[in-house]
Amino acid sequence: MAHRTWGGRFGEGPDALAARFNASLAFDRALWREDLWQNRVHARMLHAVGLLSAEELEAILKGLDRIEEEIEAGTFPWREELEDVHMNLEARLTELVGPPGGKLHTARSRNDQVATDLRLYLRGAIDELLALLLALRRVLVREAEKHLDPLYVLPGYTHLQRAQPVLLAHWFLAYYEMLKRDAGRLEDAKERLNESPLGAAALAGTGFPIDRHFTARELGFKAPMRNSLDAVASRDFALEVLSALNIGMLHLSRMAEELILYSTEEFGFVEVPDAFATGSSIMPQKKNPDILELIRAKAGRVLGAFVGLSAVVKGLPLAYNKDLQEDKEPLLDALATYRDSLRLLAALLPGLKWRRERMWRAAEGGYTLATELADYLAEKGLPFREAHHVVGRLVRRLVEEGRALKDLTLEELQAHHPLFAEDALPLLRLETAIHRRRSYGGTAPEAVRERLEEAKKEVGLD
């Protein structure tokens, strides 16, 4: 039997395996709400330009309402042999209302139809992600404020070696800044994708007297796309969203990695809540940060989606090719992965138990205050490079002797350089070092509090 959608050209039906391979219903049925919305608007436009009678429009709209009720109730008869969500809805509409259902596809192709559905879907998905990003940013702000008084200090790292002490609040706000940019990228992507492909038809437009501005306006797009080839052939809007999701997941992965490290016995800075950890089937003592590990791993999954779709579109000639069917699975999966990761971190972070004394001791160790001594000599007039060497030699001696910076006496400091005076000794205390980093964007409490107050206003917590 010939295919009901395009069977006129063919003398026999498709191979069974080929038909299953060709079908996309398993994943594009997620677009059913957008397809119904588009169908309603397209039908009203066809009526407005005289291509549907009032009676035909009424029948179509009632049929679409019935279909929506069936899908919501779980009684809609999805049929894989109809390939995709578009043909399933159209076939059911025709069953319900007869010939008017077959008129709905006038002046439209599945090429512009699916491109329109996908843009509509992404608009809604981005709005959901922006709300989740806002919620997580609020969590980060609250956690920063909670750990600012009393001061929670941890070692800052470069090359994963202890470098200089920083406030835990400063650490939280670092991720706040990353997530703020992530939200901006999604907002930018939404702005660019908000143009309507509907009416481009297969690739060349249509001879019917349609009103593309009508459908664009009714669907909430800012305008119709200006080139019919571009409208059906381009997936850069999907790639841009995937790029934003990829960067966002990279940031969540970095946070997860740090928390995994900090929760080990070797660091011992933090304990992960029981609700977000698992045990071992053989080792009774284990508490594994599985959720954080999965967020870290799933960042690779989203990166794979971005790379995969890039590979799909890189060599496609204009206009539509079936290759573009491969845009939805990675995109929908990446959206769900990022959404769930945001929700999980927003729930996990407030339950973290930070070990203030352990962090403080670690921040004091590792010669993290050596830079304070080099800065001191530079402030006294010694060229910084020379000051760097002086303190470097001092640290080497302490390492050899197994001593800490805070053990130094004034006499020992002066033995390394005569510019050291009594006022250098407070620099060997963690509190002094933290308060000295008061440059704009620095880790001093007053600098962090200033940024915290700004961040609270940005997320509506003022």
UniProtKB/Swiss-Prot annotation:
Keywords: Amino-acid biosynthesis, Arginine biosynthesis, Cytoplasm, Lyase. It catalyses: 2-(N(omega)-L-arginino)succinate = fumarate + L-arginine. One of its GO terms (molecular function) is argininosuccinate lyase activity. Its main location: cytoplasm. One of its GO terms (biological process) is arginine biosynthetic process via ornithine. It is found in: Cytoplasm. Pathway: Amino-acid biosynthesis; L-arginine biosynthesis; L-arginine from L-ornithine and carbamoyl phosphate: step 3/3. It holds the Pfam family Lyase_1. Its EC number is 4.3.2.1. SUPFAM superfamilies: L-aspartase-like. GO terms for cellular component: cytosol. It is an enzyme of class 4 (lyase). Belongs to the lyase 1 family. Argininosuccinate lyase subfamily. This is Argininosuccinate lyase. It comes from Thermus thermophilus (strain ATCC 27634 / DSM 579 / HB8).
